[in-house]
Design a protein with these regions (language model features):
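Domain-level signal for soluble alpha/beta catalytic cores
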Residues: 1-136
Length: 136
């Protein structure tokens, strides 16, 4: 049986220059430490949809062409840089991130040629249905 090994990372919801992991490393640095012979995909998840396009373009400049890129953002309120208690309480979802608005982000990501799209925390079935309808 063949298994697909994936590398998944969350991105800081706010950054000044290059996108960073929540642990503080720039994406370029983190991706440079991956053995791409052992994975099939790099995924960015559970972060604001607004930061994903920059993460995609940054990754595309670093990873081999045969590695898939995927994105599934969340609908939570942004986590501030340096906030250490991000999971200490239930976070509110963004009311303005409607299925239609999320679909606009998905279209942007697909124009950047990502292979995998979906949704994370706060992205519901109605959001996913819009993505599925786009593919029809």
């Amino acid at each position: 049986m063949q298994y697909a090994y994936l590398d998944e990372s969350t991105i800081e919801d706010e950054y000044k220059n290059l996108p960073k992991l929540r642990s503080g490393e720039e994406i370029v640095t983190a991706l440079g430490k991956i053995d791409f012979n052992k994975i099939s995909s790099v995924l960015f998840n559970c972060s604001q949809p607004e930061v994903m396009a920059k993460a995609i373009t940054t990754a595309k400049n670093v990873i081999p062409e045969n590695i898939h890129i995927g994105v599934y953002a969340n609908a939570f309120q942004p986590i501030k840089i340096g906030q250490k208690d991000a999971n200490s309480q239930i976070r509110n979802t963004r009311k303005e991130l409607t299925p239609e608005k999320y679909l606009d982000f998905v279209k942007e990501w697909t124009e950047l040629e990502v292979d995998i799209v979906g949704g994370c925390c706060g992205i519901g079935p109605e959001h996913i249905k819009k993505i599925c309808d786009l593919k029809k």
